Amino acid sequence: MSKKTIWEYLKAKGFSNVATAAVMGNMEAESNCISQRLQGDFTSGCRKSVEYTEKVDSGEITRDQFIFNGPGGGGYGLCQWTFWSRKAGLYDLAQEQGVSVGDEFIQVEWLTRELWQAEFQPVLKVLQTSQNIRECSDVLVKQFLRPADQSEAVLAQRAKYAREIYSEFAGEQAEDPDGMPDTVEVSEAEYQAMNRALLVVMYLKDILNMLEEFDYD
């Protein structure tokens, strides 16, 4: 599943552009949006993650071993699910649907089902009402994903990922928490018009300076 497909899937679930970007920004931080990603796997092509997923799917790694992070387990998937009950939900849903636990669609489906659970209703409410990317991203970090590191640097980086994704898929520039855009993009015609306006202002300023210096006596 490409990032665009994840975007469209979440949008089809009713999430706004802002909420979708916040979710995907956190996925980017957690797993680089790779659904088979196993925590700590930096091998080429995520080879270790692929092998681990195959063992889970085949039953060589049992359900209990998967959900309790052993052997060689840990955070897994798009959101790096780690807590046993949440991994159990993902595993059981994949089994129910007859697909791999590393399947992108099943993971996004599980994510949305989790957000509708009573425990995460406060998170869902923010995602459904806020138009602030930083606010949506922060609530996902602090109340949904709950990584060990929730420092300002982490929060800022995840919000940055979210704004980049928003700009890529929503077709417009995302806003910072203070309401100011990251950058302002203008067309060549707009740029030339601004230059002409600036020249006029400078010209008028020169005229005023000359008039001030003119001796009317």
Question: Where do the model's predicted regions map?
Answer:
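Export/targeting segments at the very N-terminus of extracytoplasmic proteins
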Residues: 1-33
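Peptidoglycan-targeting cell-wall enzymes and recognition modules
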Residues: 5, 31-128
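Generic structural hydrophobic/aromatic packing signal, biased to beta-strands
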Residues: 10, 79-81, 162
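Surface-exposed patches in mature extracellular/periplasmic domains of secreted proteins
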Residues: 14-24, 35-42, 121-132, 136, ...
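Extracellular structured ligand-interaction cores
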Residues: 20-24, 75-78, 108, 137
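Conserved beta-strand and immediately adjacent loop positions that scaffold enzyme active sites
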Residues: 23, 65, 182
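Active-site-proximal beta-strand/loop segments in catalytic clefts of secreted hydrolases
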Residues: 25-30, 82-84, 143-144
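Non-catalytic cell-wall polysaccharide-engagement segments
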Residues: 87-217
